[in-house]
Amino acid sequence: MADPAAATKYPLLKLLGSTWPTTPPRPIPKPSPWAPKKHRRLSSDQDQSQTPETPATPLSCCTETQWTVLQSSLHLTAHTKDGLTVIVTLHP
């Protein structure tokens, strides 16, 4: 007991200090995240300088290519020389 006045005013407190086991306080747990974290990769100037620019004219001549934009998605449909149909959907 650090305060002698408390010991004379409350004599039973000294019994508490001698027999009561002292345990360290438990740390407060961190709350669980309410949603998973999404890690975004920020583009830097170095990344942009390494990506090739889109050519003004297509690399291959193709008259059968169709594309549509639906909300924020791009849908591409192309046909190969062998008659195979290729459908690509790009989402942001």
Swiss-Prot record:
Highest taxon above the source species: Viruses
Q: Could you tell me which residues carry Phosphothreonine?
A: 57
According to the record, mutating residue 23 to A results in: Loss of E4-mediated G(2) arrest
Q: Name one Pfam family in it.
A: Pap_E4
Phosphoserine, modified sites: 32
Task: Look up keyword Phosphoprotein and say if it applies.
Answer: yes
Q: Where is this motif: Association with host cytokeratins?
A: 9-12
Q: Where is the composition biased (Polar residues)?
A: 45-54
Keyword entries, A-Z: Early protein, Host cytoplasm, Host G2/M cell cycle arrest by virus, Host nucleus, Host-virus interaction, Modulation of host cell cycle by virus, Phosphoprotein
Remarks, miscellaneous: The major E4 form is first synthesized as an E1^E4 fusion protein from spliced E1^E4 transcripts, such that the first few amino acids of the E4 protein are derived from the N terminus of E1.
Q: What does this protein do?
A: Contributes to multiple aspects of the viral life cycle including viral genome amplification, suppression of suprabasal cell differentiation and egress of newly formed virions. Induces host cell cycle arrest at the G2 phase by associating with and preventing the nuclear entry of host CDK1/cyclin B1 complexes. Inhibits cellular DNA replication by preventing loading of host replication licensing proteins MCM2 and MCM7 onto chromatin. Within the cytoplasm, associates with host kinase SRPK1, a splicing factor regulator, and inhibits its activity.
Family, according to the entry, reads as follows: Belongs to the papillomaviridae E4 protein family.
UniProt comment concerning the protein's domains? The LLXLL motif located in the N-terminal of the protein is responsible for the association with host cytokeratins.
What is the name listed in the Swiss-Prot or TrEMBL entry for this protein? Protein E4
